[in-house]
Amino acid sequence: MRVVKGRVLDVAVDIRRGSPTFGRHVTVELTAENHRQCFIPRGFAHGFAVLSEEAVFQYKCDNLYAPQSEGAIIWNDPAIGIDWQVPAADVILSEKDQRHPTLAEAPELFDYSVDYYA
């Protein structure tokens, strides 16, 4: 994941049950100027907030899109405590993204003991 125009807060959350870092997150600011990139491994939830008026992303995936494998957690889960750097009143979400469960309520997550790259 990288940003070629604008400014984005990129977030990854460990959703591997049994992981010593389960439920913890990391954030990194990606901009066209800082040239940072972020790798989101399997077993991590990914989200972002656009911090500029507009942004253009480039990203690479290790597999084809598979909607049947898609899952998500709600962006503002208080147990995770992400500072999105955007006032909640200014957040724009799709209808779909408004209905996601919290991490504790999420039905199917990754298992830390499984190698998802094998």
Spans of model-derived segments:
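Beta-rich strand-turn-strand
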Residues: L30-F39, F44-A49
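Active-site region of the double-stranded beta-helix
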Residues: M1-A32, L51-A118
